[in-house]
């Protein structure tokens, strides 16, 4: 699970605890063959020594990184295929002939605005002028009002509506730390060479876009210095990503009256009133220390410093939707942070806006053309097979009492399953896309529309039929607040799911994804929520202690991994995903053998069923990645890198050793006493 500050400009929802299989992403159009694709293998490597290189080395050599990507793997291949399919759908729409206000008109016009480079370059910074003028005259006491009313401004904190962790049937308002232009606090606080390089690139970026927005050289330098000073103060007060993994620590309900007394410079009653929320008397504060820092900064920083910081956040939010000068400055920063060498083509960048802002509208078109009903039926069957297998694993646990096992079964039985697409599509009739206005102004309207959509849930019962990913998304998730697992249509394709592949391969791929999401319900965060999605302790003290001891050992294993140079993996940050990877593999392997019903599966192309199962899993994570991206993801991504999702996870799994005859002395071998098995 990942806890992430809410930003309206890059998220269409406010979700504190949504857990996805991957954070990242086949121009592949070919159907995956039945049996192992030997072209993916590197036969020069013994599977007993480095299973990842053996299983994926051929693919890695055949697919070197292009300049457009800082990381590219089979997952990204599928994401690229889906992107091409969505592009065909969008370019096939004729917005000029569509009824005004229709989804077709909105999607088509929004995409066309992003593609019109001539107009974007001609307009330059003009779309920012009015809002920047407002920011430039904003007094200290109006900072909070500005944040409440200016769509797209990224500053200080985020707020949004989500299910109450203590009463998951009702929606409540949350406050979360934010306001960091570089995204992660470590970039401000660390002295590593990578962090220092990213800081310098960020300052150069701010200087460039400020001057493009009309600031003089001297004023732009002042803006950079003031912004870095405020953001560094926020970073020092922010919780680390490891600390954010504790949901209880981020649950601090306070009354509005109490907030007004403690944090007088952050007038949250006024803030919410301006957003149309007048009946709020209570707010769940994620990080009180961060809120105290915001209060202190607003009270004590100079008005000019506050204005510069607000302007920097605003310009940065808009930069991707302006002319090439802004785009190039943004990309220069990205090059340093991730190692990417070439910008995405314009059509991909333009497509991401309607795909994100009107995701379900495009999703409806996507499933009509690309998602067969038979895939949904087969997935539902697979999910139930995995549910049964996880129940067997719970029964067989030696470290858990019968009392806690009974509660675990209750939670497993209560899992809600979503496959393919929602039964009810979202209504976008309230969103206005006006091609006469600038691209950025239309994006602001979409941000405002999605913000109001979220706020409309305040103090209402939780809608458990709502989806938190669009159908065309190549991903899957578990949401502990609704105790649901979701598998969008986009991921139900090769290499994850192939109706023509044999069962061993499908269980090794999509089966593991299913098991992964189910296991999230019982990882270090998910286990703290009950069957109804409430933050509640259903464990005996002894069982909780046993779980924590096993989890700590698994975290320590991953902490020992060197990912680049002298940088280690962060096993505590990635703990939930590592637990889910292991659980997914073990449970799916059991489900596969259950499906055989005592029959012996055939050997295909010289590979036994179990060998095909584990090769299928490894091939899902085949990929190449740049060192800068490794360093960036180690800070920001709660998933381990693909290599270690394979090698480090498999080294704890006995059936894998048996499948590939791994013995003491082999590099993949781990002594029984050192293995960690949780679920």
Predicted regions: what they are:
Residues 6-17:
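Bacterial N-terminal signal peptides that target proteins for export
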Residues 15, 79, 262-265, 284-288, ...:
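Intrinsically disordered, low-complexity linker/terminal regions across diverse proteins
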Residues 22-34:
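Bacterial Sec-dependent signal peptides at the C-terminal "C-region" and cleavage site
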Residues 40-61, 188, 192-211, 575, ...:
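Hydrophobic/aromatic-rich, well-ordered segments within soluble, folded domains that form packed cores
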Residues 46-50, 54-115:
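Active-site-surrounding "flap" and adjacent substrate/cofactor-binding loops of secreted or lumenal enzymes
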Residues 59-63, 182-183, 495:
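Short, solvent-exposed loop/turn elements at domain surfaces
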Residues 68-90, 218-237, 506-512, 610-614:
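Short secondary-structure subsegments characteristic of cysteine-rich extracellular domains
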